[in-house]
Amino acid sequence: MPLRLDIKRKLTARSDRVKSVDLHPTEPWMLASLYNGSVCVWNHETQTLVKTFEVCDLPVRAAKFVARKNWVVTGADDMQIRVFNYNTLERVHMFEAHSDYIRCIAVHPTQPFILTSSDDMLIKLWDWDKKWSCSQVFEGHTHYVMQIVINPKDNNQFASASLDRTIKVWQLGSSSPNFTLEGHEKGVNCIDYYSGGDKPYLISGADDRLVKIWDYQNKTCVQTLEGHAQNVSCASFHPELPIIITGSEDGTVRIWHSSTYRLESTLNYGMERVWCVASLRGSNNVALGYDEGSIIVKLGREEPAMSMDANGKIIWAKHSEVQQANLKAMGDTEIKDGERLPLAVKDMGSCEIYPQTIQHNPNGRFVVVCGDGEYIIYTAMALRNKSFGSAQEFAWAHDSSEYAIRESNSIVKIFKNFKEKKSFKPDFGAESIYGGFLLGVRSVNGLAFYDWENTELIRRIEIQPKHIFWSDSGELVCIATEESFFILKYLSEKVLAAQETHEGVTEDGIEDAFEVLGEIQEIVKTGLWVGDCFIYTSSVNRLNYYVGGEIVTIAHLDRTMYLLGYIPKDNRLYLGDKELNIVSYSLLVSVLEYQTAVMRRDFSMADKVLPTIPKEQRTRVAHFLEKQGFKQQALTVSTDPEHRFELALQLGELKIAYQLAVEAESEQKWKQLAELAISKCQFSLAQECLHHAQDYGGLLLLATASGNASMVNKLAEGAERDGKNNVAFMSYFLQGKLDACLELLIRTGRLPEAAFLARTYLPSQVSRVVKLWRENLSKVNQKAAESLADPTEYENLFPGLKEAFVVEEWVKETHADLWPAKQYPLVTPNEERNVMEEAKGFQPSRPTAQQEPDGKPASSPVIMASQTTHKEEKSLLELEVDLDNLELEDIDTTDINLDEDILDD
């Protein structure tokens, strides 16, 4: 069966002809040197051009990253080597390296060396620590030296390919080649070493359209690959996958199996001739250079072949080698979240196939290895072969002795105890299968669940799943798609009833088989269930768990990680990365058990589990309870004062909220509590809260609404003392203390407003205020100050002023007493009164003047409501206003509105 290899294009960068490509080891960058003399750096994640180097006007045939120095090294047809800092774009160094075009650059992985090859038939070694001096020259080729590559298993050895039809292997320190490989009929364009430890192989591609595999220890050609229709310009062993990549001037890239030499795939992106290829250890990305630009493709899946059983034994594949590690062997080693675990690795042997996936069965006794279209079931302890076969896919059932294979796109077979039990053809074909409590089969029509025992259709769902995860109880299942995931409840009792009675069974299965609990718009990469909690890694590298509609983030991961399993006794979750590093994160089983009990409404169990939850975790549990609607329990459980205060407000628990507000000493909390107290008619508590919050506006509202005159008076004094002039003014004004209002405006420099207030209510004070206004204004504008008219000097401009003096005195003598608030309905509103008419015939007991004889300002009268009563409404005097927790005070009933502009500070 063919190697299952997903190929996805990640980047297409249109440009001039690309002569070389390279991938950065840590950044998501591709380096491309162009025939027009430029070098470009592309970000293949954002698909943007991030850097450009204008090297020269001639073709740049070679360019490499030197990541440890932040360099880009280029070689061009002007025979110059140039070194650029890719962060600053500064040219660090430049020198003439050869006497003809420079074809290739190879960077030593550990030493400060680069090797260059040229059309001058020479290879040179340069040392950048010695001011880029030429340390050695390698002579021997009789034509252009097209490519050089350093042996990854022996960094002192390198190989070269030349148009003289030979491949030569060299040693640093020796100017002559170790040996020469001959076999191509035309010039050799490219060469590469196999990086695995099991084969001493070289690969070469030539103008004879052939690709040859060489054993450089035996110096023999072990395989010739035919298929390209034009010159082979690039050939490479992939450092991670068991594949060979070759590119040709025929415009195709061919992918071959490196063990069977079978052609697996042919890529043609229509960008004319292929010139170069680059890959990187630890990555599945491959860069390709063409006449019309460059492309990055992702080959295969980066998820490692790795599995862990319930006891903490981890098995993984490193290429074809299977290794094991045991978490128990760590003993009492201190483990920190997110740090790599220091595991002792044990080699278990080699696998006959290249493993793409490894998976334990539910009880952990067996492990299946899948790859190359085959599967092998081994014993987990000793890796002894138990069963094998051809299959495109494999899935374990919840019963550890049962499994299914997808033999083709139309046939699924079920095995029990390693013997075939049943074979069937799903109605709409089988593109993929999924294990668990039910056998899932994906087809073009959607997802179908079948019974393992009799392959009866349980339910067909119109969905295209990527992963399916079943809980241990079989009650819950997560179906993950490309864009979101669904949580479903499997109703096994209804399924059994429907199977017996055949009621509710349609062509799409049993209608009531599943109940949808929720859909979450997040992409699941890997996942597992612990109780009723679904733990998963997301596409944005977050480690989350979902329970009861709530998503809790356990950790933000710094790279892509894959879930292995959860060990309850350790209270830890284990994950692995593509480099086979194992990390873990703390996740308390008591928290998960509590949340599971709440979801099942088993509160007696939840109460038993609660004491085992550490205090630092209880707030997380309280948030969960709140989201489930159990706010009273959340208030009891939570240890976070902020959270408890919010819950107390929501529940109307005034005492608890008051205690928390006292402890917090927060103005915001006092304001929130005051609002709650008012809504509960607890006005004395509201008053105390507003005082703590220094909310003078709220206090004024409360005082006026309750008719509390003494409170208004105290508020006026306090507000003025604290600089809350608007509230102070309004408080004085409501009490009829117009003198205090006037003096407040004068003290705060609001002299125009003071003048208008005096003209309206205190005409006896107008002259004094105008003089103050004039003095103040003269400091800014003398002419404007002189234009102000004093009403006592220009009576003709202020008609009715003399009468106003009389009215002011009349009001003072006749309206000195306050009226009870309960008589408000009997008082004629100010807007309906004519004070001038009421004061007719009044003779003041003293002359109306601007000032008293001693020179002090005359005391201001207070304008009060009319004392006229109507006999027919006498019974209304008995009216009482019944307000809980309030004591009505005598207040001024003067209903006077003040222009808002006057109130602005």
Curated annotation (Swiss-Prot):
Q: Per the record, what phenotype accompanies loss of this gene's function?
A: The knockout of the gene results in early embryonic lethality with no viable embryos recovered at 12.5 dpc.
An example GO BP is: intra-Golgi vesicle-mediated transport
Q: Name one Pfam family in it.
A: WD40
Which is one Gene Ontology cellular component term of this protein? Answer: Golgi apparatus
- Keywords, comma-separated and alphabetical: Acetylation, Coiled coil, Cytoplasm, Cytoplasmic vesicle, ER-Golgi transport, Golgi apparatus, Membrane, Phosphoprotein, Protein transport, Repeat, Transport, WD repeat
List N6-acetyllysine occurrences by residue: 627
Location comes to: Cytoplasm, Cytosol; Golgi apparatus membrane; Cytoplasmic vesicle, COPI-coated vesicle membrane
The UniProt annotation puts the region (Disordered) at 837-873
| Coiled coil stretches, renumbered | 867-891
Q: How does it assemble?
A: Oligomeric complex that consists of at least the alpha, beta, beta', gamma, delta, epsilon and zeta subunits. Probably interacts with PEX11A. Interacts with SCYL1. Interacts with JAGN1.
Q: What is the stated purpose of this protein? A: The coatomer is a cytosolic protein complex that binds to dilysine motifs and reversibly associates with Golgi non-clathrin-coated vesicles, which further mediate biosynthetic protein transport from the ER, via the Golgi up to the trans Golgi network. Coatomer complex is required for budding from Golgi membranes, and is essential for the retrograde Golgi-to-ER transport of dilysine-tagged proteins.
Sequence similarity: Belongs to the WD repeat COPB2 family.
Extract the PANTHER family matched here: COATOMER, COATOMER SUBUNIT BETA
Protein's name in the database: Coatomer subunit beta'
Q: Which species is the source of this protein?
A: Mus musculus (Mouse)
What gene does the UniProt entry assign to this protein? Copb2
